[in-house]
């Protein structure tokens, strides 16, 4: 079910941390009502832009709240 209120398209950038650790960059599109209800952006390196249709292949619709919460946390996952 495509959002009738548009999407927030999020592009995060790779962040190198101490040692060999990093946070991977990602591109996702989130239905606006879901994004406005649940999102974490503090201290992040990211950009967003609104659009009528999803801009990226990874898309979270309004009925995917649980999946979006997990993916939102994963945006800031440290690896390495």
UniProtKB/Swiss-Prot annotation:
Capsid decoration protein which helps to stabilize the capsid against extremes of pH and temperature. Once maturation and expansion of the capsid has occured, trimers of soc attach the interfaces between the hexamer of the major capsid protein. Acts as a 'glue' between neighboring hexameric capsomers. Dispensable for the head morphogenesis and phage infection. Homotrimer. Interacts with the major capsid protein; three soc molecules associate with each interface between the major capsid protein facets. Keywords: Capsid decoration protein, Capsid protein, Virion. The keyword Nucleus does not apply. This is Small outer capsid protein. Belongs to the Tevenvirinae Soc family. Pfam families: Soc. It is found in: Virion. One of its GO terms (cellular component) is viral capsid, decoration. The keyword Cytoplasm does not apply.
């Amino acid at each position: 079910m495509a959002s009738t209120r548009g999407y927030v398209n999020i592009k995060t950038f790779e962040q190198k941390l101490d040692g060999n650790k990093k946070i991977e960059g990602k591109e996702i599109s989130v239905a606006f009502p879901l994004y406005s209800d649940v999102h974490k952006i503090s201290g992040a390196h990211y950009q967003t832009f609104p659009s009528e249709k999803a801009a990226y292949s990874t898309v979270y619709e309004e009925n995917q709240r649980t999946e979006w919460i997990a993916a939102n946390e994963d945006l800031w996952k440290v690896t390495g």
